[in-house]
Amino acid sequence: MVSAWIYFTSLMLTCANIMLQMYFTVMYSDLKDDFINPIDLSRKLNWYVLPEMGFQAFSALLLLLSGAWITFLLNVPMLAWNAKMIMSNTHMHDSTTIFKDVSSRQKRSFFKLACFAVFFFVYLFLFVSRLVDE
């Protein structure tokens, strides 16, 4: 029963990350269409950058500690990418350079959204299969 709750927790954290990535994508398109200024965009999005990375890291840690190696290994590339962004200090949005970076950040957000969607369906399948097994 513990593994089912681990997958359920990972499922909910991934759901939160999907919502955050959709919010990021909408905000980037608002900046492109000039509905929001760069200072407001940076202020709004920087508030959610570290929680998004934290949710993903906590989910991966739960999977590691529960012994779900395959699903943990599925998370390792995104963990490494997030760690690289934090170490190179490119994870936060800078209002002075956001116009230059908006298309690459939007592509990054789409990629993360796709990855989190895959994680969501994997966790959903594993959660349901663990419940059926018990």
Curated annotation (Swiss-Prot):
Q: Which GO terms describe its molecular function?
A: signaling receptor binding
What the record says about family reads: Belongs to the cornichon family.
Q: Main localisation, per the record?
A: endoplasmic reticulum
Q: Which residues cross the membrane?
A: 8-28, 54-74, 113-133
Protein name, please? Uncharacterized protein C2C4.05
| Matching SMART domains | Cornichon
Q: What is the lineage of its organism?
A: Eukaryota, Fungi, Dikarya, Ascomycota, Taphrinomycotina
Where is this protein found?
Answer: Endoplasmic reticulum membrane
Q: Name one Pfam family in it.
A: Cornichon
Gene Ontology cellular component annotations, sorted alphabetically: COPII-coated ER to Golgi transport vesicle; endoplasmic reticulum; endoplasmic reticulum membrane
Q: Which PROSITE patterns match?
A: CORNICHON (PS01340)
Taxonomy, superkingdom: Eukaryota
In Gene Ontology terms, what is a biological process of this protein? Answer: endoplasmic reticulum to Golgi vesicle-mediated transport
PANTHER family per UniProt: CORNICHON-RELATED
The record gives the membrane topology as:
Multi-pass membrane protein
Which InterPro entries does the UniProt record give? Cornichon, Cornichon_conserved
**4Fe-4S: present as a keyword of the record?**
no
- Native organism: Schizosaccharomyces pombe (strain 972 / ATCC 24843)
> Which keywords does this Swiss-Prot/TrEMBL entry list?
Endoplasmic reticulum, Membrane, Transmembrane, Transmembrane helix
